[in-house]
Amino acid sequence: RQRQMCMRDSLFHCSGGKDRTGVAAMLILLALGVSDETICQDFVRTNVCRRPELEKIWAAHAEEIEAHPEQKQFYQGIAGVHPESAPFVLNTIRKEYGTTDAYLEAEYGLTPARLMRLRRMYLE
């Protein structure tokens, strides 16, 4: 119980702030019962936050992108995230496990009781 009380506020990040960290954030939001729509919106917010880096990359590779426009999407994946990734992850979880709660229990030991405890701790 004391350990749980100490873990109320948490911060996690990485230098890039996307990909694995983005999926980790998605899983936390899933555990809290957040809607798919909100999870997907949060995931693609990375592109807004990392827009300056993305524009620098596009500028540095402008000639290549002009010659091969598909490269713009490639660089999007380096500096940002592809919007279709979040729904793909959520759909894959449901396809493989039936429900997201079944996935969270099988892979992370988050039983229904633990999920309820997390939701009580972190949601108003």
Label each residue range with its predicted role:
Residues 2-7:
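Short, small-residue-biased leader/transition segments that mark boundaries at the very start
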Residues 8-32:
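Catalytic cysteine-centered active loop of the rhodanese-like fold, especially the PTP/DSP P-loop
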Residues 24-124:
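PTP/DSP superfamily signal
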